[in-house]
């Protein structure tokens, strides 16, 4: 696969291969047939990063071939959203003509939304001065005149310059409601917005008859917490990254949701708090014992859940587990299978044309 050509004719085959692979991995745990959620065959990725190559008077985006490590010039990138593709061309044309903006520019990061907003970060191997800021403002205004709803950011060593602000707001149609999600530059967001909608709607569906409260670990900007709030009395969610916590708090207010509480701590710290091993000032004013959490939601990093967190989640009647790495999910299921059974399984094709799989399982306590 080259950056400018996607093997769209092979989309169905690669999806069928992933489905078979996931089903085989889950068969030792008596999993039901997987529900399959497709991605758009192209223009599905809402963010992209490119190195910038200087060749005398020319300047262009590049990527590196994963096998040969050779650089590849990138004019169009069908993996990324149409909005990013449009901006790539317009932005590079403008920068190419301005020496102050192109000098020691080595990378450009793009973030886009289904709501039509864009954020571009220009990364430099040099200090950014007032002259750079003036030219960057002119560039931003020029691109806005071309119809781009754009935020522009400059980065250099220990420097971050925001011309306006460092976020854009996404609006996702989720199970009959428009959900607003603030997305902060350089913070995690789901890369495939269409598949993210599938994940949110599946999570809502599998918990529609849930009772009590929901506990979520690793909540990020509140992506799942806010969508799932409609199915629960209250939601208690943890997140460690400050920008994500701030975005989550904004999203709670923007969506007029009054039953979600975000606390800034790691899953490991929360486990210690629940077990009474440590006390945390961050939990002052929050009575953990008042929550009747019958469902726990986890969307861990690729490494999966650590042993202590596995023990923590086993205490809950229902576990909703979204995994970006089925191998570590299976490792966790080796322990979870003794207390819970898989009642729903889903494959989300978040990363088409790669071996990566995103999946979800609903686990329910054995009788």
UniProtKB/Swiss-Prot annotation:
According to its UniProt entry, this protein's organism is Yersinia enterocolitica serotype O:8 / biotype 1B (strain NCTC 13174 / 8081)
Q: Which HAMAP family match?
A: RNA_methyltr_TrmA
One of its Pfam families is tRNA_U5-meth_tr
GO MF terms listed in the record are:
rRNA binding; tRNA (uracil(54)-C5)-methyltransferase activity, S-adenosyl methionine-dependent; tRNA binding
PROSITE patterns cross-referenced by the UniProt entry: SAM_MT_RNA_M5U, TRMA_1, TRMA_2
User: What is the protein name stated in its UniProt record?
Assistant: tRNA/tmRNA (uracil-C(5))-methyltransferase
What family does this chain come from, according to its entry?
Belongs to the class I-like SAM-binding methyltransferase superfamily. RNA M5U methyltransferase family. TrmA subfamily.
* Catalytic reaction(s) noted: uridine(54) in tRNA + S-adenosyl-L-methionine = 5-methyluridine(54) in tRNA + S-adenosyl-L-homocysteine + H(+); uridine(341) in tmRNA + S-adenosyl-L-methionine = 5-methyluridine(341) in tmRNA + S-adenosyl-L-homocysteine + H(+)
Cited NCBIfam families: trmA_only
Q: Which gene encodes it?
A: trmA
Which InterPro entries does UniProt cross-reference here? MeTrfase_TrmA_AS (IPR030390), MeTrfase_TrmA_CS (IPR030391), SAM-dependent_MTases_sf (IPR029063), TrmA_MeTrfase (IPR011869), U5_MeTrfase_fam (IPR010280)
The residues that the entry says bind S-adenosyl-L-methionine are 190, 218, 223, 239, 299
The record's section on Gene3D superfamilies has: 2.40.50.1070, Vaccinia Virus protein VP39
Instruction: State which Enzyme Commission number(s) the record gives.
Output: 2.1.1.-, 2.1.1.35
Give the first-level EC class, as a single word. transferase
